[in-house]
Amino acid sequence: MKFLLVLALCAVVYAKHEAYIGWKSYYVGVATDAQAKALEPLIQKYELDFLSHPTKSREGVVLVKPQHQAGFVQDIEAGGITYRIHADDVKRQLEFDDQLIEMQRMSSFTRTAGRQLPYDNYQELEVIDEYLDYIGEKYPDVATVVNAAESFEGRPIKYIKISTTNFEDENKPVIFIDGGIHAREWISPPSVTWAIHKLVEDVTENDLLEKFDWILLPVVNPDGYKYTFTNERFWRKTRSTNNNPLSQICRGADGNRNFDFVWNSIGTSNSPCSDIYAGTSAFSEVETRVVRDILHEHLARMALYLTMHSFGSMILYPWGHDGSLSQNALGLHTVGVAMASVIQSNALPNFPPYTVGNSALVIGYYIAGSSEDYAHSIGVPLSYTYELPGLSSGWDGFHLPPQYIEQVCRETWEGIVVGARRAGDLFRK
């Protein structure tokens, strides 16, 4: 049995990650705003991929390709920017992570009688889609699966509607939660599927089912999500191409820069090879159009929009493009703090505390075209980005060990419960 386990782990380890041969990751620290600004041109110059951006209060982590490492180090040393090695061999670290995932899979296989659940491990897209179909078939009185569209590569973009009144009661507020806009943020989809589980399979808050209508979209970006399992673990964007010949080499757009609110004005890129490429136009991506259409279809009753990202233990609200505050800033902050407080009371002690605030001010940089800002701009009163927790600013921040997935799902659900009830109170006033 032990021999078979070793063979299984080896098969996982050597199956992928060749794209990251020779890559390293670095901790990067900045002491001044000028140093933070000096990093910006290096992103394009050296094709840097920041897993987390540095601020004056915390280090960031950046991935660097082998051909750029010497130049990158030389430039940041010249600018007085501090750095240290985070992972000397990114490929080897990813192989170790794969072992943890496979061990978790084997452990849960026995616990769940062979059934793969989308919230007890980092599961492939097919497992998530099968779960949605299972819920729709087993609970047809309250759950309806919607195949909203096909992704660029032809995969279904599925979401589930949960309602005791078939979405026909105009007095019920609508809660919309999505995940997986950024393909590599693997903790995001489980947090959404756990919410489905709690609303349908393991109901402990009956009022949430009776008094609200729910829309839950676990994977906005199925093409990108699938690609992170088969090719590049740190892929972030969609997988589309366009008339620009460069897009055949550098595919996709950043879904969270593709929404039509001050689109492509700041914190984005016009280069298809950039991880923050805003696309050829607002809503150029079918994936973001699905989110847009859901928001507009139910806008009159849309009381709360949550988009799940990672990482950082943050609850963020508009406006992210310039750091200004919404007219509803007090309400946004009050509800955000209430959600964060209950999450914190249910969190493990080794998880960092949640921070609540304006997106740009908390994360330390501006972005245009986000789903959070767009939803608020069209009239959704409470619109938030959840940056789900990690164990550190390093590897275990971005790639949370799989044994912590269910814990994150549980505590995040408690925040959703509070947010929904607060949103319902405001909706009914």
Swiss-Prot record:
InterPro entries assigned: M14A-like_propep, M14A_act_pep, Peptidase_M14
Entry EC number(s): 3.4.17.2
Regulation acting on activity, per entry: Highly resistant to inhibition by potato carboxypeptidase inhibitor (PCI). Moderately inhibited by leech carboxypeptidase inhibitor (LCI) and tick carboxypeptidase inhibitor (TCI).
MF annotations from Gene Ontology: metallocarboxypeptidase activity; zinc ion binding
Signal among keywords: yes
Co-factor(s): Zn(2+)
Binding site for substrate: 182-185, 236, 256-257, 310-311, 365
Localisation per UniProt entry: Secreted
Record-given protein name: Carboxypeptidase B
